[in-house]
Amino acid sequence: MSAALQWTEMRQSWRTLARRPGYLLLAVLTLALGVATTTAVFALLDQALLKPLPFPQPERLVTLGLSSDPGRNVAAPGYYPVLRRMSSLQSIGIARGFPVPANVARGAASEVVASISADAGFLRTLGLPMAAGRNFNDEESRPGGPQAVILSHRFWQRYFDGDPSAVGRTLQVEGKPVQIVGVLPAEFPWAEPFDLIRNMQPDLAATNLSTNEIVVARLRPGISVAAASAQTATTLQALLRNSPHMDASWWASLQRRPPNALPLQDSLYDANSGNTLWLFFAAAACVLLIAAINLTSLMLLRALGRSHDSAVRAALGASWLRLSLPALAEGVLIGALGSLAGLVLAWLGLRLLGGWVPLMWMRGEAPHLSGASVLFALLAGGATALLAAALGIVRGRRRNLVTELAGGGRGGWSLQAGRLGRVLVIAQVAIAVVLLIGAALFTRTLQKLAEVPMGFESRSAVVFTLAPVKERYITAADAVEQTRRIVARLQQVPGIDRVGVSTNPPTATRLSWSVEIDGASSVDSQYRLATPQFLEVFRIPLLAGRGIADSDVAGGERVCVVSASFAARYLHGQALGKIVSLPDDGGDQRVSMRVVGVVGDVRHTSPAEPPEPTVYQPLAQMSEPMWQILRGFGALTYAVHLRAGALGADERALRAAIEEVAPQQPIAELQPMQALVASTTGEQKLNLLLVGLFAGLALLLAAVGLYAVMAVAVAARQHEFGVRAALGAPPARLRRQVLGEAGVQIGVGLLLGLGVAMALSRLLQRYLFEVRVADPLAIGAVLLVLAAAGLLAALAPARRAARVPPMQALRAE
């Protein structure tokens, strides 16, 4: 068969297909939905996990330090000198890699931006060329050296319109002119987006881990991560064993956080994102599988429809290839159109998902389609369509040629084809059950989380952050005075009832600190500096003693308030009057405070996590060393409680009030406290959004598939139904028969899907909160919805079977 003849045959098949736009549209849309879901999730996977970091030889990049969260390392500047001497390293750098607020100004305009800090070795080790300017030099990385800043490409474009002459200019950073020495390349992946890098001048004698530095290193060629990890452990254990701060509690802490080396990609990004993204991909693959099953059913029915024509052509001597070309041509066209439509839907889906997927998962960038994602879509769509066409061809070859010719084209839905159709329906229903149970369980999880008391009242409260400009508010006393004046002025703004300030809002952030109880061993606790009204703004209840008072000022007795869980866990429920101590400078100096009150517990991270023991210290009593450490973490949180019935103060009124008492002091955007609380369940909402969307698509496709199979089966059995009607069978009996057959398929699919869901219970359980996979409410709802949807899909074919005119069947005889 010549190529020209093959091409003619394919074009003829496409013209024939175009004359049936309904079938073509249904097939393309079915495939597009499956391709879109898998492509969108593959794009997330590729961006987060699969695509190598754009640094030269990224497999040689590691972080060194003590294990912190799963998959993360943390280090102190004092570790840097000994780590630099490790023989396994080619280069090394240090950074404070989590963005913190920084106040920048150009002329009269000021704003808060996100900044990290790093030494010259950091960018040198990563190895990316600058878009403009240069890296920090060694002089700028020494204590007492000149200040410098490197801009992110995005900030350079926004703030300087991409002007190359911005390099060499000065930018007001924290009230001090700082020279811009370089611009980062457009693609600079990091865990969280930032606007600028400030030059870091580490104190190489400091071993305090509270500032969360990371040490990035490039391994020498041929050195494995395991070998570097072993050398890191030996080096840091020797350093820490000889530390003057090492005691039994420190040593126990070291055993829980062993020193090691971790690949940069693993230690930069959220360790939980990989598991969640693979879960999403599995769910999306289920949708593609259902779409493939539906497409197979459609193309099989299409093949059966031309079976008589194929039998005639075969009898006239047509080759197997020529008989297969129409189905293959249709598969190619449907695959191409479905892939392209799926790509468009995936692109739209990623744009809509941008605000839901954490940037930390996506290397600090918004989700987008890559070249690999486009290739994946084309391969997935093309392969699915061709496999569906191939199955139709194989099933068509099994039909008896003589029987087909004798039937005159009335052979229709054979016993074997009918059995295959039922199997495909059962498979679709089973897959839909698994996805719907997942969506129902995530819904139940969100319901349970919403019922958990956070320990504070978020209604009528708004928050914003303010970082005192460092060059104007240098000391702790300066910061306290600025805070006092701003609070006093804000309380005069109409609509504001109370104003409180703390180092952290009640939830969505953590600040861990080591606390010593009555001179005994240290314990881990959450730590907050707060003004007197902060606890009142959020109505955190006072359980015993008193709260923070206006009289708790510098020079007076140092006091603190502890949470109920702190009192119960560490003070045996007898907290009042006890003495707790905090490290004042990361070393031997400690600040002792008397416990004067006990307040209710607060869930600092999310409703899924238990309340953590917490110490609240009056902001006015913070020590100078403590302030210098804490301001490195960023800003103070101002909480404003609005009067009942008041419309509230808008952001412009707040900014104007602050400008009166603290000129050129920028603040971050105002947000309702309820929005901050809602963000604590963002991951669970993302789970529900995606799995729920996939489950809805699966339900729709399964219902369409059941309808198609039942409709064709009824059409193929019209003669049978007509004869039975002629013999006296009432329409209700024929209806019940068709619905009963559909019910059997649905029931088998439900049981099979339920069994698969139970088999996956251990995998699903990690994503649930106070809900079991075998939750009767979730399972009952899923079974009811699927059974109803399936029977509704079968209702139209059943009614058609009951309406077959008896005379039509008799005339056919």
Spans of model-derived segments:
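Small-residue-rich transmembrane alpha-helices
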Residues: 41-44, 296, 331-401, 444, ...
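Short, strongly hydrophobic transmembrane alpha-helices
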Residues: 20-48, 290-292, 339, 421-445, ...
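Mid-to-C-terminal secondary-structure elements
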Residues: 115-138, 146-276, 351, 438, ...
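Interfacial "coupling" helices/loops that link adjacent transmembrane helices in transporter permeases
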Residues: 291-335, 704-746, 750, 800, ...
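Membrane-helix entry/capping segments
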Residues: 1-26, 54-56, 67-70, 109, ...
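Alpha-helical transmembrane segments of integral membrane proteins
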Residues: 1-25, 264-270, 299-325, 329, ...
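Alpha-helical transmembrane segments
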Residues: 33-60, 350-359, 431-460, 763-773, ...
